[in-house]
Amino acid sequence: DEELRRLHARLGVYSCTGNHEYRYEAEQKIQWLNRAGISMLRDSAVLIDSAFYVVGREDVVFPERVPLSEILNRQNVNRFKPVIVLNHSPNDLDEEVNAGADIALYGHTHHGQAFPGNIATRLVFEVAYGYARKGDTHIYVTSGLGLAGPQYRIGTVSEVAVLNVKFEK
């Protein structure tokens, strides 16, 4: 809690849910993150500084997950402004591409976490780690900080990805 409260950004700190929130006590975890100053975006969009949108997706394990195009329409997202989508699992990049997202950010894969998992994730996900561009959408999948299952990494690294974003007219 204390460490998360140290996260600060001039325009706010935003996140989306992932599969681990839904393993148990999801609502308590989400409330805890909100109390720590992290705005959890749950199939919702927020206009930042009247300049761009951040859209947070519910994880694919959430049964009432809403299609991205519906979120954008329901929240009257101005498609002439840049749209950044936070989506935990990179299992359907076409949804963000087809919805016209400018940037789509993902996690989930842990970059395989331990060899040979990093090879396996490349077989499962179109983009398992790093940067790619698909259509007009810039995609980044981070290996993240956390671990799933075994508490080690082999052949991959934990990371905090720092992206410098500049939108041109």
Q: Where would I find each of the regions flagged by the language model?
A:
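Soluble catalytic domains of enzymes that build or remodel membrane lipids, polysaccharides, and related
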Residues: 1-169
